[in-house]
Structures are given as C-alpha cells and as structure tokens.
Amino acid sequence: MSESELKLVARRIRSFPDFPIPGVLFRDISPLLKDPDSFRASIRLLASHLKSTHSGKIDYIAGLDSRGFLFGPSLAQELGVGCVLIRKQGKLPGPTISASYALEYGKAELEIQKDALEPGQRVVIVDDLLATGGTMFAACDLLHQLRAEVVECVSLVELTSLKGRERLGPIPFFSLLQYD
C-alpha cells in the first residue's frame, strides 16, 4: 500500500465532535469526495488490496446504501467486475429478499433483488465506514440467503472502539483508515 496515497486519503477525512448527537465524533468523507486525487487514491488502494488478496477471484462488488454507492461502482470498474446494490427497505423494484439489523432506537432492513446474484458468486461488500457492524452483518446475511460467497468486506474508515469487525465473525474485513 502506498504510504503517500494513504496520507492523501487520510488528510481528506475531517472530524466533527458531538455530531449527530453529543458524545459522537463524526468522521466526514465529504472532502475526500470533493477532491478527485484523494478519491482516486482511495479506490486504487482498496482495489490494490483486493487484487493482491483475491487474485482476480471476485465476481461482484456489493455497495451498501447509501455511501457505499459512492465507492462501489468505481471500485468495481477498477477491478473489471460488476456492481450490485444493497438498499434500504422499499427502494428496489421487483422481488427482493431482506435482512433486519438493529439501530440505536429500533431496527431497519436492507434489501437486495432476488436475481442480483447467482449461487456461488464471489462478492466483496463495500461501505464508507464500519462502526458497530450491524449494517455490514445484515448485508452478509442477504448475500448468504442468495447463496453467494462473501469473500471480504471493506470500508474506507473503521471505528475500532465499536468492534464492528468482531461482529462479522470469520468474514475477512479490511479498512484503509482506523480511528478509535
């Protein structure tokens, strides 16, 4: 991994204390998206990791609603594979399957179209940030329901103190940047 590219990416993540609620330190990726060099570097770094780890044995990238959509298609294009969408409930047409996950005050659901993947296809799930792991875990559940193989989950940022990586169990996880 190129240290200079990683530094370029890290410089474009800013922090906002007490947002959206007191006690939370929000990691904002907006400056990264605004800067084409930093965004390209983030895609190159993620793609480089996946190429070296899976040597071309990835069929699809699955982008998580909504900020995973910002990275999923570009990452898929860099790898020469397709991209499928995992959406919040009620956003996809046609037959879907769903998986629930816990929120701070209730629960939510993710969906994927039933015909999005074939059994045995190898998929990498991407999102902008891993916190508690609830959304990523629900996405893994969806892909397992379709009998696809989740080969890895990746994100730009990982909040290590929230232990989301542990929630994923044996599924490999990679992040470019780690914060407490």
Swiss-Prot record:
**Phosphothreonine PTM positions:** T135
Transmembrane regions: none
Quick one: which pathway?
Answer: Purine metabolism; AMP biosynthesis via salvage pathway; AMP from adenine: step 1/1
- Residues with the N-acetylserine modification: S2
Q: Which reaction does it catalyse?
A: AMP + diphosphate = 5-phospho-alpha-D-ribose 1-diphosphate + adenine
Q: Which residues carry this modification: Phosphoserine?
A: S4, S15, S30, S66
- Family matches, as Pfam families: Pribosyltran
The UniProt entry, under PROSITE patterns, shows:
PUR_PYR_PR_TRANSFER
Report the function annotation for this chain.
Catalyzes a salvage reaction resulting in the formation of AMP, that is energically less costly than de novo synthesis.
The protein's name is: Adenine phosphoribosyltransferase
